Amino acid sequence: MKLDSFTARRGNPELVAPARATPRETKPLSDLDDHWDLRYLQPSLEFFRVVDGDRRPARPGDGIKAALAEALVYYYPIAGRLRELPTGHMLAVECTAEGVVFVEAEADVALEDFGEPLMPTFHGAEGFLCDVGDTRVIVGRPLFYLQITYLKCGGFVLGTYMCHCIADAFGTIQFLKAIVDIARGEAKPTTLPVWERELFLATSLQPHIKEDQKKLFDELESTTCDDIMVTMPTENMVSEYFILSQIDMAALRRHVPLNLNKTVTSFELLTAVTWRSRTIALGYRPCHIVRLMIVVNARGRWKKLPLGYYGNGLLCSVIETTVNDLCTNPLGHTIELVRKAKDEMKTEENMQLRVDLLPLWREKPYIKVQRIFEACDIKWIGQDTLDIGWAKRIGGGIPTVSPPNLTSYQFLCKNEKGEKSTVISMLLPQPAMDRFKKEMAAWLIE
């Protein structure tokens, strides 16, 4: 059964406030949080199978709702509202304790109807998510939405929207883990939250801009564009997931030269192959400049970031080359390009430079850079730690809902054989998607 073949019967939405009194204050966002490209509600889905036990509530939603209220005591800014400051069109959080949205729903389907083990694609996932309207409207409205959908098998789905200005994917999982920790019976979250958004504020009013970065800024001000990935509305594209088994990964590694085979990571290899395949599929001319944007998690790399930081902590590095250079050289050359982009974020000095550039990006119009491929590794995001005790997580991830995301995510799941596999998301026009599939299939031929 496909996810688009059922109807969820939703109850009335209600606001859930923190379980106890919380500070009333205004909290500014970081320069990274306040980036215009993050001003939207990010969806996610988590599927659970209920297990027997003494702590199992008669109705899972009661336990989740109570845990949500308790978690908001610690994560109280999430219960507030975004306001636009008088100057600079910048946002801040008013900690008003107005609450987040909670909805209960029912659907006459079972976990088994979606295939076992559960894997993407999550087409039609809107049934598991609150009706939030325009996901780009974030000021003056709730910052978090949670819908629990009961399935006829006794399992349930947690569908959430988190305002991306408040938390990135890692921070969102941290908040969800706080909820499930308390629902499991813990007195408080196992990881306590840290706000400290000043850690991602620019420290230089006149940062040094490298030549390649200047070209990006100049392009944002350009009024001409011939890249279909920019000119075509994302709603007219198709989004698909590609699942690569361990056998598939072994087939890809056979294309890697010996001097790189033992050191290349799965992210580097998959990013190199998908970047080349996508570039060919889009039909860019050999002389065109193409770019790769690597999204790097600063957690664990930047010593000043404390455990529990749940704000946006993903920084980007960009490299460029020509289509001819990318697609006619051996795969090892592409892997080296990917590594070059990753290495840009190796030093704390370079990470601070990226932060110092953020205010300049805010002044630019909301235009996507031409012929750029954005890759993000969320394989170790921590979804497998969502242990409620009386319910076991069996799958989940980022669903395909409007507006689609241009970023290509890599994450983990189990395939039909129960083997750990890597999933890649891809958004393309339909003709390009057809060509992309053929290019990927060619790489997987042993």
Swiss-Prot record:
Instruction: Give the residue spans that cross the bilayer.
Output: none
For this protein, the record's InterPro entries field holds: CAT-like_dom_sf (IPR023213), Plant_acyltransferase (IPR050898)
Q: Does the keyword Lipid metabolism apply?
A: no
Instruction: List the keywords (alphabetical).
Output: Acyltransferase, Transferase
**Which catalytic residues are annotated?**
H164 (proton acceptor), D387 (proton acceptor)
Identify which top EC class this enzyme belongs to: transferase
Presence of the UniProt keyword 4Fe-4S in the record? no
- Enumerate the GO terms in the molecular function aspect: acyltransferase activity, transferring groups other than amino-acyl groups; hydroxycinnamoyltransferase activity
User: EC number(s) for this protein?
Assistant: 2.3.1.-
Q: Family per UniProt?
A: Belongs to the plant acyltransferase family.
Q: What does this protein do?
A: Hydroxycinnamoyl transferase that catalyzes the transfer of an acyl from p-coumaryol-CoA to spermidine, to produce coumaroyl spermidine. Can use feruloyl-CoA as acyl donor. Contributes to the natural variation of spermidine-based phenolamides in rice cultivars.
| The protein, known as | Spermidine hydroxycinnamoyltransferase 2
Q: Which organism is it from?
A: Oryza sativa subsp. japonica (Rice)
